[in-house]
Regions:
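Expand to "…catalyze enediolate/carbanion chemistry for C-C bond making/breaking, isomerization
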Residues: 1-278
């Protein structure tokens, strides 16, 4: 673990102990997390006892992502853009196939993040496999996008009414309810509008907060969540910069060798046969 990762661990410990953080999230979907990055994030997360790793897979039937989630010891897997009963069935059946008898050891959730998914939600709850689903994540940014309204409307009354309706129906089915998308201190009134017991967690891009306690968090908690993501992005940048520098040195050496060799033979070989882009 490098110095920056140690600082990330200290920040996570602070967030867990003082601001009701219960997990960290990585996305194989929109974020495009690579396995090497996820493994480094797992190392950081594992250094803070009691924090779980959540993995958003690339689709409802992203089987390789599920196997990768097993390798990472993920506590939860989340399928994005599940909009129909059939897509939900595909996800649950894929999870049953991958996890087998160990399916009960992981929580499986789906993102309800479009208006089409909202309209189909009652039918989703009627599928025979619904008892295997543990919860839903209401994705507000994609939700407003699917409704043709701007990101700034994630805390609007229209989105709140829709979210409260989803939460009630999910809770009637015994499901956990999570809210994400555009989460900042400005979202606290939105979260406080949920009836008691209807909101289990809310999440930023990387940090997962547990309710109801986290609803009372001061603004500094959200600033620290942003700080963690900045540190994570810097750590990722540093990692790939080392690889890039390593290749750059090799490229420079090979180009010099190429030009020296070319000078020795260029009088005997047609120029058009040797074209090297700098």
């Amino acid at each position: 673990m490098n110095k920056l990762e140690s600082q990330m661990t200290e920040l996570l410990l602070d967030l867990k102990q003082n601001y009701h953080v219960s997990g960290i999230k990585a996305e194989f979907e929109a974020e495009g997390t690579r396995m090497e990055e996820a493994m480094r994030l797992k190392d950081v997360t594992s250094s803070v006892p009691g924090l779980g790793l959540n993995i958003k897979i690339g689709g409802c039937e992203a089987i390789k992502d599920m196997f990768d989630a097993i390798s990472l010891g993920a506590q939860r897997i989340i399928a994005p853009m599940v909009e129909t009963p059939y897509a939900l069935q595909k996800f649950i059946r894929a999870a049953q196939m991958v996890y087998g008898d160990d399916l009960s050891q992981v929580e499986i959730l789906v993102n309800i993040e479009t208006y089409a998914a909202y309209q189909c939600f009652s039918d989703m709850l009627k599928i025979p496999e619904i008892s295997y689903l543990n919860g839903i994540v209401i994705g507000r940014v994609d939700m407003v996008g699917s409704m043709g309204i701007g990101r700034a409307q994630v805390n609007s009354q229209k989105v709140l009414d829709l979210s409260l309706d989803l939460a009630k129906r999910a809770k009637d089915q015994g499901l956990k309810v999570v809210v994400g998308g555009g989460v900042s201190v400005d979202a606290i009134p939105f979260f406080k509008a949920f009836p008691a017991g209807h909101l289990d967690r809310f999440e930023t891009r990387k940090i997962i907060f547990s309710c109801p306690d986290a609803i009372q968090n001061p603004e500094i908690a959200f600033i620290k969540a942003v700080q963690f993501e900045i540190m994570w992005l810097k750590n990722k940048r540093n990692y790939y910069s080392v690889i890039a520098r390593e290749d750059e040195e090799r490229i420079q050496m090979m180009q010099e060798r190429y030009h020296v060799s070319l000078q020795k033979i260029q009088h005997t070989i047609p120029e058009h046969e040797f074209i090297l882009t700098e």
